[in-house]
Amino acid sequence: SRRQKQLIIMLDRGLSNREIADELGISEHTVKVHLWRLFRRLGVKSRTQAVHFARTHGMLNG
């Protein structure tokens, strides 16, 4: 989804949950829920794994 793409880009930039929440205008709890769903969708368990997956699968291009 568009939101998940935004999250991956922000994770790649090294932003914290609080920084992501501030930038998107949502609560930190909502960020955590989005990340949990993203990790589940990608089959990963961490921010680092999510960024690695995104880079390897061309999700950060364009």
Regions found by a protein language model. Name each.
Residues 1-3:
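Short helix-coil-helix linker/hinge
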Residues 14-49:
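Recognition helix of helix-turn-helix DNA-binding domains
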Residues 57-62:
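…primarily DNA-binding HTH/wHTH and HhH modules…
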Residues 18, 55-56:
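Terminal helix-turn-helix DNA-binding modules in bacterial transcription factors
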